[in-house]
């Protein structure tokens, strides 16, 4: 009998840093300011990592890539996702699918949604759907002071 699927959720929020490259969904948005962070500040990739780790019961981004781990300083969200994919496989899990929603006014995700979905799906070896929303001017994302992301993931034990 197959094990039941496991679901995880992940969130991430970072303030905008003037002049920092904007990495989001594994993509560079060259005309936008990026987010502060120990790594590249890609809130979507970090939320996906958290969702995958949560679903597999393997901790969270802070435990795996935290500031106490200097080897991960400045690392790309894409590299983090590849590492998490390998960690899940090494622990007997297969990724079924994932979804990530970016919360913020900029950058505009819609024009690059297909590109992001293809990249992220390739990185984790499973379908990833991408969406985006705003907070209608409320909170730090609404004021353009930061970006947030929420992700879910489905995994099964092999």
From Swiss-Prot:
Pathway: Isoprenoid biosynthesis; isopentenyl diphosphate biosynthesis via DXP pathway; isopentenyl diphosphate from 1-deoxy-D-xylulose 5-phosphate: step 4/6. Keywords: Isoprene biosynthesis, Lyase, Metal-binding. CDD domains: MECDP_synthase. InterPro entries: MECDP_synthase, MECDP_synthase_CS, MECDP_synthase_sf. 4-CDP-2-C-methyl-D-erythritol 2-phosphate binds at residues 12-14, 38-39, 60-62, 133-136, 143. It comes from the Bacteria. Transmembrane segments: none annotated. It catalyses: 4-CDP-2-C-methyl-D-erythritol 2-phosphate = 2-C-methyl-D-erythritol 2,4-cyclic diphosphate + CMP. It is an enzyme of class 4 (lyase). NCBIfam families: ispF. Involved in the biosynthesis of isopentenyl diphosphate (IPP) and dimethylallyl diphosphate (DMAPP), two major building blocks of isoprenoid compounds. Catalyzes the conversion of 4-diphosphocytidyl-2-C-methyl-D-erythritol 2-phosphate (CDP-ME2P) to 2-C-methyl-D-erythritol 2,4-cyclodiphosphate (ME-CPP) with a corresponding release of cytidine 5-monophosphate (CMP). Homotrimer. Belongs to the IspF family. This is 2-C-methyl-D-erythritol 2,4-cyclodiphosphate synthase.
